[in-house]
Amino acid sequence: MSAEKAKAYWQLMRMDRPIGSLLLLWPTVWALVIAAQGMPSWNVLIVFVLGVFLMRSAGCVINDFADRKVDGHVKRTKQRPLPSGKVTSKEAIGLFLVLGISSFLLVLTMNPLTIKLSFAGIFLAFIYPFMKRYTYLPQLFLGLAFSWAIPMAWAAQTGELPWIVWFVFVINALWTIAYDTQYAMVDRDDDLKIGIKSTAILFGRHDKLVIGVLQLVTLAMLVLLGQHYELGQSYYWTILVAASLFVYQQHLIRHRERDLCFKAFLNNNYVGIVIVIGLLIAFW
């Protein structure tokens, strides 16, 4: 394999832009820390960290395969490996299979419940890229796909799925819809021209309001989560930091400028990190 082809594969997997993997990783770590009520098992943690990066890469590959005919018409995506011809469709499918199989082999080291849950995760990861053609709610499907690691991680750590798992699942799904709507605001003008659907288009001039409501509900549910586990004051300070980050994001998107909407999206990485820190300190 030439260096140029290897670089194209690397870009196709978004390894040069790991923000998506990090946004998938942090909630997975939330689940592991809460399930363990402290530091999770090292082998489970390692499997899920590797699995997150492999599955996110697989998701990026199948997403670009699904969008290969439209990405060339979008300013932000026209230089991606598939629309630019650096990687063929056949090569992309082969890479997707390698990444997907590698992820599944990791899951096979976990307990039977985790293995069963993984099939739904694979299904969600596969269908999400195609949803933007059929519904204005593809961000909802991304929320489900990005949250599915939560029950999987919990099951791997404890072998059980208590109701609180699904509470955390909803927290992350709402947060994901909020930040991916910010992301969709970047491409809204291009998407309207080529017929791609998104919540940014659905919400229209109410986009900032809906994002704000989703962020407020996310924060409220995080507070309720802390009350359920009787977490200490340090946890609530981190929620306050997360709230301030959301306020900053609202400031960034106030004029719906592309670059600032993308900056707001990227800022969510810090939200995920802050909550991880809060949970680790609280359960330590």
UniProtKB/Swiss-Prot annotation:
Its cofactor is Mg(2+). GO terms for cellular component: plasma membrane. It catalyses: all-trans-octaprenyl diphosphate + 4-hydroxybenzoate = 4-hydroxy-3-(all-trans-octaprenyl)benzoate + diphosphate. Coiled coil: none annotated. Belongs to the UbiA prenyltransferase family. Catalyzes the prenylation of para-hydroxybenzoate (PHB) with an all-trans polyprenyl group. Mediates the second step in the final reaction sequence of ubiquinone-8 (UQ-8) biosynthesis, which is the condensation of the polyisoprenoid side chain with PHB, generating the first membrane-bound Q intermediate 3-octaprenyl-4-hydroxybenzoate. One of its GO terms (biological process) is ubiquinone biosynthetic process. GO terms for molecular function: 4-hydroxybenzoate polyprenyltransferase activity. CDD domains: PT_UbiA_COQ2. This is 4-hydroxybenzoate octaprenyltransferase. Keywords: Cell inner membrane, Cell membrane, Magnesium, Membrane, Transferase, Transmembrane, Transmembrane helix, Ubiquinone biosynthesis. The chain crosses the membrane at residues 33-53, 93-113, 136-156, 159-179, 209-229, 231-248, 264-284. It is found in: Cell inner membrane. It comes from the Bacteria. PANTHER family: 4-HYDROXYBENZOATE POLYPRENYLTRANSFERASE, MITOCHONDRIAL (PTHR11048:SF28), PRENYLTRANSFERASES (PTHR11048). It is an enzyme of class 2 (transferase). Pathway: Cofactor biosynthesis; ubiquinone biosynthesis. It is a multi-pass membrane protein.
